[in-house]
Amino acid sequence: MDELAGGGGGGPGMAAPPRQQQGPGGNLGLSPGGNGAAGGGGPPASEGAGPAAGPELSRPQQYTIPGILHYIQHEWARFEMERAHWEVERAELQARIAFLQGERKGQENLKKDLVRRIKMLEYALKQERAKYHKLKYGTELNQGDLKMPTFESEETKDTEAPTAPQNSQLTWKQGRQLLRQYLQEVGYTDTILDVRSQRVRSLLGLSNSEPNGSVETKNLEQILNGGESPKQKGQEIKRSSGDVLETFNFLENADDSDEDEENDMIEGIPEGKDKHRMNKHKIGNEGLAADLTDDPDTEEALKEFDFLVTAEDGEGAGEARSSGDGTEWDKDDLSPTAEVWDVDQGLISKLKEQYKKERKGKKGVKRANRTKLYDMIADLGDDELPHIPSGIINQSRSASTRMTDHEGARAEEAEPITFPSGGGKSFIMGSDDVLLSVLGLGDLADLTVTNDADYSYDLPANKDAFRKTWNPKYTLRSHFDGVRALAFHPVEPVLVTASEDHTLKLWNLQKTVPAKKSASLDVEPIYTFRAHIGPVLSLAISSNGEQCFSGGIDATIQWWNMPSPSVDPYDTYEPNVLAGTLVGHTDAVWGLAYSGIKNQLLSCSADGTVRLWNPQEKLPCICTYNGDKKHGIPTSVDFIGCDPAHMVTSFNTGSAVIYDLETSQSLVILSSQVDSGLQSNNHINRVVSHPTLPVTITAHEDRHIKFFDNKTGKMIHSMVAHLDAVTSLAVDPNGIYLMSGSHDCSIRLWNLDSKTCVQEITAHRKKLDESIYDVAFHSSKAYIASAGADALAKVFV
């Protein structure tokens, strides 16, 4: 019983010094380490039994060094923990403050951007109102000080000095200089302006001494402060070129008499515009203008540019006619201007009639050659003239040809087949990209600070910058073996795939699930077609998307009714989906093609025959081709795009044959004239027909893609397209791009005009030295797809 009990809630019990064990009979003493400060302030121990215990309780508590150290360590640890909590809270609050500050700054930037857009829209709206008012009433709409909004800074807006009065000399000179600059940019120099004003002045019998300075100032102020700025009028030339050409129709009537042209020149131009052109005569070069006016050939040449004057005037005769105001300006619209200017309408009419008679009496004046003008218009690409009807271009070509033949300039030549170089931008770029492809602002493109003409002139050189780049979007993973064929629904974002696992699957690209660790989306099939007893090798969908056809290694063609794109994948079995079976082939069906014109189906088989079917008939097989295997075993088949009464079939011998579907006779044999001993390398894997041109394209086992003329049967181009066998081809609906797939695991997109590769995509992995089996374009949406031996189908957008 000599040991002491450790007390309190703190440090370990310690043996007391011998002087503390004075109680007789081994009574327990008090340990300062047990109930002292180091012990954590625990309650005192029981009193000792001996009488010596009483004096010990009256002594002060004693502290030990270990107990004190323990207490300090305990308090330090608590302090450190609280400080760590405080620092964490401070960091969280600082992060919260930074986030709120950033959010506030972002909201302020958004507000500034919206205010800027609102001001730009208000400015554009005022301009449109002024243009509409001028077109409808023939007078300028007074909107006060209409100017471009500025966005330098808020301080600049608040402290912006008021502009000078509009009638001040400085504003007048600056406006004249700005107008002259924009006229030079559109190719309308002072010399041409002076010649035209001199001609109109002499026509109307007016002298140079007429005091018209105030009228000139008024017209200039209308140009500067009215509905359109000179910059926008310069842009209007490019935008309304098709309307101007169609209005004046000067190309179609290239060989007509001079009377019609002069009538249009006199009656189609408002007197106010003529006055403005007369006033331009005050600007230098008067001697040169007089010399040029005396030359009748120069006058005739200058008349060719009347459409530029009208377009530069903005609201001239061309726009008035195109908007349905008749072939002449309404005299009621001109009467207020005539009254203000004190113009004698009777004198002008008399002078017009006299001038017409003089023009009828003129003989022997040779019309200027317009070939350069035609070439200039032809050089304008589709980016600058997107809305000119093709008929106008054809008329210009025919007019140019008539004039050239009349002059005996050159003999006729056979033109080579040219592929379209533009026009399919909406498919390749997408509808939203087309709206942004001009300048990125749509209708607000006119409100930029820089010169808009520079953008339009640079567009043809920068076409590649606006070309769409295809990126993988959807991955279709539910097949258990290689995907041999695929086809898009003609309207919906729906895809059908055919696989070696004996099934076809229907996919709705709008029903997606996120893929793991990938930017693409996985799509689950919404329906599985089961009827084949072997691998499915070929596929075709009807033009209305209501039926599809599949050919397999079991020598049958299954005819399916397409389920709804919103079908439930877990619905009960629907027997009506399988519409029928076309039986006739005796070996694997390797190719199918459907024509919606007569609802006919073509199939080619390893039995050596090509068959034409009408599934609606009781005897669906209409005709059989190559029954004697004269050309070999067919590998692929397609309808001729520009002549649906013909079809083209490729064979394993390396040749392709065009057949007449009615007579069953072979019309043209497309041969590349290679050594017949290399038959294995000359094997054609796929043949497609261009949708609009008489051109057939073939994909070969020897890595080549070849182009043939359907009329002559001659090869017009050949190129090494891939690093391995080319297995599949597809032409986009506009006939501008060609897509090819190969066993080198790549998809390549080709420009048919230049025969150059514009994009390469690595899409699939190899399986048994095979990779891509099929590629396809969607006929109405911006989708392309590929099918591979790795049991995957991929869709790109």
UniProtKB/Swiss-Prot annotation:
Localization recorded for this chain is:
Cytoplasm; Membrane
Which residue ranges contain the repeat WD?
A: 478-517, 531-570, 584-623, 679-718, 721-760, 767-797
Q: Name one Pfam family in it.
A: Striatin
What are the UniProt keywords, alphabetically?
Acetylation, Calmodulin-binding, Coiled coil, Cytoplasm, Membrane, Phosphoprotein, Repeat, WD repeat
Q: Which domain of life is it from?
A: Eukaryota
- Using the record's annotations, give every residue carrying the modification Phosphoserine: 202, 214, 229, 257, 335
| Start-end of Acidic residues biased regions | 253-265
What are the recorded Gene Ontology BP terms?
A: negative regulation of DNA-templated transcription; negative regulation of hippo signaling; negative regulation of intracellular estrogen receptor signaling pathway; negative regulation of transcription by RNA polymerase II; positive regulation of transcription by RNA polymerase II; response to estradiol
Concerning Gene3D superfamilies, the annotation shows: 1.20.5.300, YVTN repeat-like/Quinoprotein amine dehydrogenase
- PTM N-acetylmethionine: list the residues: 1
Enumerate composition-biased segments (Basic and acidic residues).
Answer: 230-241
Q: Give the record's membrane topology.
A: Peripheral membrane protein
This one is known as: Striatin-3
Q: What organism, scientifically named, is this protein from?
A: Homo sapiens (Human)
